[in-house]
């Protein structure tokens, strides 16, 4: 199992929901954290909580729909002088449900792709060469089970594009200890998922981070969190390595 104690991880969208739970879990494993949100005030609570667990942590802020803000955030992270060995691209934006799908505005696609595809891709491209140079690293991109839903076409298309980027990048790190995979929390009762969702946010732990801990050299696969609900981290990793092959397959 990949060891994260003392390593540094970037978690986007860490202030609430799945990102918040992910930050707490990773801190419990001894992982140092860089926590992203749109505003530094949003991460004050989680920053204090993870630091209380004895790890080092920093907060950064950026509007992921603004490429210049993403680039500024990456420069700020570089200025910290730490090696980011783990990237969890958790942040996402879900657009309105368009019952009249033929009236879907172009803006749905524009904002969805900026936040859900372009920003995580830029983050991947920034850190992946550094990981390859050091010979180790993990990138986990959060996708969605929403597919073939024309009423949420902008969102589903942006996640499908992220899936493709992840698979393609995975082929470039074959044979190394740098792994890049996909995760999906499932439909959870968060601000994004809504109150009607069937799954508690806590059900996504530890599955949402299983792709960080797998250590079998396989990239480009889908490791949906609900497949590992109720398991220990060790059992989740064993299941992932035994049952989930590459490339991507749900």
Sequence positions of predicted segments:
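Catalytic Tyr-X3-Lys loop
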Residues: 102-121, 136, 140, 162
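Amphipathic alpha-helical dimer-interface segment in Rossmann-like NAD(P)H-dependent oxidoreductases
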Residues: 115-133, 171
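Conserved glycine-rich Rossmann-like NAD(P)H-binding loop of the short-chain dehydrogenase/reductase
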Residues: 29-45
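C-terminal helical subdomain
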Residues: 175-176, 182-183, 190-242, 246-248
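Conserved glycine-rich cofactor-binding loop
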Residues: 8, 15-17, 39
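Conserved mid-core segment of classical short-chain dehydrogenase/reductases
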Residues: 71, 92-110
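The beta1-alpha1 cofactor-binding region of Rossmann-like NAD(H)/NADP(H)-dependent oxidoreductases
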Residues: 40-41, 60-73, 106
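Catalytic loop of short-chain dehydrogenase/reductase
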Residues: 93-94, 106, 125, 138-161, ...
């Amino acid at each position: 199992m990949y060891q994260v104690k003392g390593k540094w991880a970037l978690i986007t969208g860490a202030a609430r929901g799945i990102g918040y739970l992910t930050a707490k879990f990773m801190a419990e494993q001894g992982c140092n954290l860089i926590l992203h949100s749109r505003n530094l005030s949003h991460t004050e609570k989680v920053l204090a909580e993870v630091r209380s667990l004895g790890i080092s942590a920093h907060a950064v802020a950026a509007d992921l729909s603004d490429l210049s803000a993403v680039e500024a955030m990456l420069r700020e992270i570089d200025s910290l002088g730490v090696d980011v060995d783990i990237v969890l691209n958790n942040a996402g934006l879900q657009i309105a449900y368009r019952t009249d799908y033929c009236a879907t505005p172009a803006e749905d696609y524009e904002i969805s792709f900026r936040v859900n595809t372009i920003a995580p891709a830029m983050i991947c491209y920034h850190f992946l060469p550094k990981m390859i140079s050091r010979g180790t690293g993990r990138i986990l991109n959060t996708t969605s089970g929403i597919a073939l839903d024309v009423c949420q076409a902008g969102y589903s298309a942006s996640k499908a594009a992220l899936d493709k980027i992840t698979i393609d990048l995975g082929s470039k790190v074959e044979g190394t200890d740098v792994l890049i995979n996909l995760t999906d929390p499932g439909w959870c009762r968060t601000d994004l998922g809504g109150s009607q969702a069937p799954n508690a946010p806590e059900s996504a732990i530890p599955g949402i981070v299983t792709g960080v801990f797998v250590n079998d050299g396989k990239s480009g696969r889908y490791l949906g969190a609900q497949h590992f609900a109720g398991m220990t981290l060790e059992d989740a990793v064993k299941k992932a390595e035994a049952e989930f092959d590459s490339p991507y397959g749900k």
